[in-house]
Amino acid sequence: MHKKYFIGTSILIAVFVVIFDQVTKYIIATTMKIGDSFEVIPHFLNITSHRNNGAAWGILSGKMTFFFIITIIILIALVYFFINDAQYNLFMQVAISLLFAGALGNFIDRVLTGEVVDFIDTNIFGYDFPIFNIADSSLTIGVILIIIALLKDTSNKKEKEVK
């Protein structure tokens, strides 16, 4: 018998991430002009006010109807997977919560303003990474956690087959 995990923790994670994402974007949008930047960690991290009406790296710029439809489908799918497949896997619940929060955070921006507020500007190993936000970070961490969970699950299944 597997332990069924408390979904309240996952809901709290999602709510916290969405609130943190929206508050940080609000602060940037109301205190900085687009293009304004200040250095936080020399040669590594800047806060730069930027807007993006596309997806990562600006792809599909201006395709708002597409983003609305896809995001709604993704949010519904994440709730479905959370309810049906993640009840007994806390790691997967956290991953899905982070994906949900990230998708919702950027969706809120698109609905309210038609663009996403980005502000985290990094230079990693000499690569000037595209400017992103908390929602994007949440999506990235969620994807990484799902990959880890799937690899772990595959590894556990192989171990059981050997025994």
Curated annotation (Swiss-Prot):
Main location: membrane
Enzyme class of the recorded protein, top EC level: hydrolase
Reaction(s) catalysed (UniProt annotation): Release of signal peptides from bacterial membrane prolipoproteins. Hydrolyzes -Xaa-Yaa-Zaa-|-(S,diacylglyceryl)Cys-, in which Xaa is hydrophobic (preferably Leu), and Yaa (Ala or Ser) and Zaa (Gly or Ala) have small, neutral side chains
Transmembrane segments: 11-31, 64-84, 88-108, 131-151
Taxonomy, superkingdom: Bacteria
One Gene Ontology cellular component annotation held by this UniProt entry: plasma membrane
E.C. numbers: 3.4.23.36
Signal peptide boundaries: none
Any one of the GO BP annotations: proteolysis
Localization annotation: Cell membrane
GO-annotated molecular function: aspartic-type endopeptidase activity
UniProt keyword annotations, A-Z: Aspartyl protease, Cell membrane, Hydrolase, Membrane, Protease, Transmembrane, Transmembrane helix
The keyword Hydrolase belongs to this UniProt entry's keyword annotation: yes
Chain's role: This protein specifically catalyzes the removal of signal peptides from prolipoproteins.
Protein name: Lipoprotein signal peptidase
Organism annotation: Staphylococcus aureus (strain bovine RF122 / ET3-1)
Gene that this sequence comes from: lspA
